[in-house]
Amino acid sequence: MVITSATGHYLDPEARQVWDPGGLLKDFQQNAKWENKVRIVAAQIAELFPDSSVHVERLGSVVRAALGEAADGNYNEQSAIEWAAGFSFPANICERDSNLLDLADGDLVVMAKLSHEARENEGRLSTARVHATVPRDDPDFEKLLILCDGVQILVPKDFTPNTTPPLLRNKYKRVCTAVNKMFFEGYLEGLVYLLPTHRLLSMSGIHWSSAHWTTKAGKQKGRNIGDLSNDERGGALNSPEAKLLGQEAWGDIKHPTVDMLVGMVIRQYKRSANGWADVVLWKMDLKGAFTLMFIHPESVPLLAMQLTGGVSMVYHTGLFGSTLMPGAFDVISRVLRRRINSVIKGEIEIFVDDIMGACLTGELSSDLKDCTDVCTGLLGPNAVAVEKTGDTLATGHIDWLGWDINVTKGIIGISRKNFLRALYGFFDVDISKKVKVRTLQKLASWASRYSLVCRALRPMTSALYAESSGMRNLEVSKTLSGEAVVCIHMWRLFLVAMELEGEGYRRSLLTFELESPSFVIEYDSSLTGFGFRIFRIEYGSELLWRIASVDADFSLRGVSSYQNTMEYISVVLAFGYLIQQGERSKTVCVRGDNVTSLKWATTERFKGTLCTNAAVCLLALLSASSMDVVDATHIRGVENCVCDDLSRGVRPEALGYYGDVVINGSNSFLKNLLMLCNPLTTHSMIKEFCRFYAEVQRMVHDAVLRN
């Protein structure tokens, strides 16, 4: 069934009703450009993965699903206006807060103190709760006590309140019914004050910022924002100086990384007597996030915003839009992390208001209860959004920060929602036209994030970052380089192909924990050749296993910009030989005098495009053999004289090396690998790159199968 309206479409392509305000799904059904993209990608997948069973019809269904997911989150101003349904403030809307202001003798600071004292009795962060739940030796005990009085809006010493409101923003005026309705909801919850504008204008020390609005994925109403950065007259509350003051007051924010989350899960796995079968993951949300904090009464006069209809709003609890809020709330997050981990049997990490936990199955109930008790004990009885608490008992997997972690199989991948949005983003960009810097940064961010579980595509990120490097105006559009176009094409191909082949992007959780190295690759390169020695580590000692001198079969004409890439190719050749000799699932330390190539090898992150061919080859080798670089050692050039000589054409025999340790210079596999790494060969067209990539995969596949 399809129901259309003047402002949007309800479409049900996959037996579910999807809100399609931007007409994305309808566009796909009617737009030849989308259909053409599907056909092109299907053909390229067939070339790149000849054994794949991908067909246009199956590909189309995945793209439609991506469009459907994007449509669900593709709300716009009109969507918010429809949600507001013509809302206007009740005639007496300011009466409650005006009466409270009268009780405070017209003093906004006193008014805030009175209302905060009343709210404390309802159960919020307070000095009594801190003393009752947090030990005095906690590193953030004093900071937490300061927060009980509220977050201070820190400003430079020369800051002066502007005393009059800026002009209403055009976007706010367009969606004012939605913004006002959301502020009204906050008013009913006791989170903001609504007062007559004329009363605030008569007060001294009032600072005005702009009410603003933005979209929010999955929320038709969007999100109302206190824009503390907008004041064309100068003196905005958000500033680099204010951010620095916040860091000095609250400390640096250190959010958990995916490696930290996986490490937590692995530690529970090691506690389990039944492997993954006895590991359970769970999550819990704090309700309201920043609104769980008060604004310090002395700072409340700085948070006024003019609305329509003679009404103005003043924040007296935490808000979205202030550069100070994340740092202040992180104090609470840090304390909760320590307190919860001290009482539960498993372990948790926390990202702002998202608590993520891991434990054994029999510990789940008690850990959830203990976690809840800590949160409500510190922040009040309503601090936990109980309806959002979930675990893996029923499904075996859970979404943590956009990652789908499956403890039934012990794997991690992109969450379904994030996968579809990334797929939509890469498909939606029109590579034949100029592309906004903002869009390029989003694509680069997706590529960087998701290459964590799709190792083969890690070389396909640097060109996207390079496109927007140094550009501050995110709304500027630019013509894409050939390398960036290839990157976008390859991400389209892999996102689709990996999904349709069944497993999608998945990585074993246990691969995040790396063992001590089994081999050391010592290397050096010149612009004319490569030298490396491979040592096997046995009982803590390095034993020379192989040594090689390889001539470059291409001429770089002495151009020094190729030096880093040549150094890196030595690492590729050494790994190629290890894999050719049947080594699998081993870890390696790389040692050399070139910092850049050491960094590329250990981080699998690359800068520039000269190394792309070599990077594709190495990542293909490592992925196929389950091998990893786990350490890097930088040595001085004078300590690397053997490999330096080897790279300049001196043969191992001339240095006193004979027999089996010497790698045959006519090794055909290494010669073919070197040919594919050639930095002079470019693949600026997608067909060329697909052929190159397919050739790399065939060569690596054959080498792995033979040994």
PLM feature spans:
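C-terminal reverse transcriptase regions that engage the nucleic-acid substrate
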Residues: 394-510
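Polymerase palm active-site segment centered on the conserved acidic dipeptide of motif C
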Residues: 254-258, 347-349, 357-429, 440-443, ...
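RNase H-like nuclease module associated with reverse transcription
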Residues: 439-442, 448, 577-707
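Reverse-transcribing Pol proteins
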Residues: 43, 52, 56-249, 253, ...
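Active-site palm subdomain of RNA-directed nucleic acid polymerases
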Residues: 326-371, 574-592
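Catalytic palm active-site di-aspartate
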Residues: 283-287, 319-321, 343-362, 394-404, ...
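Catalytic-core region of right-hand nucleic acid polymerases
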Residues: 166-330, 420-468
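A short, polar/acidic, helix/strand-boundary loop motif
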Residues: 310-335, 538-569, 577, 596-609
